[in-house]
Amino acid sequence: MALVFDDRYQPREESAEALQRLFDVCFDSADAFSLSRAAWARQDHTLERALEPYVLRWLQTTRWFCYYTANSNPQRIVLYPLNEQTKSILRAQYRGLFLEDWSGRLPRWVPSMEDLCFFRNGTLLLGTVSHERICMAYPEDGELAQRFRDAIRGWGEADIWNRSISCCRRLRATPRNCVFALRRIFSANSAV
């Protein structure tokens, strides 16, 4: 089952609380997360520096969640364990899935890390592409799907994705492509 999040159905005044509820679901279900290194001119490195001691691995890949890039321009992904310290850092430092403030305007905060993804046993649980406003969840059962729906309004079945946003299909970069890249990492880091 796949769920797609459409934030048009999420009232702006609830965004901060909804993000924390979404974190609760992901923190209870995942064991690792990743962030992409942004290439923006002006960046806030606070999040990146806070997470630096917890890096499991840096990865350069041409395929990731909703990304398919040329070999000459790979994505730079950082993989982290999900533990009490990294949970606390994410809660305090990561301000929004789509890097906007509560009014829907781009904030002065432009982090050096974006595109938050959560994993469980090496499988994608939730993936985002911040600047494209893409967020999809892959709950393993109906109970977890309901927890996502209860945490934040705006989830729909994957058929909404197929009709309205074709990024992944058009680029032939399926959400599971990142699992291929992670197999090596998770097998090498059994502590994840």
Where are these regions (language model features)?
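Structured alpha/beta or helical-core interaction and ligand-binding surfaces enriched in interleaved
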Residues: 1-171, 175, 182, 186, ...
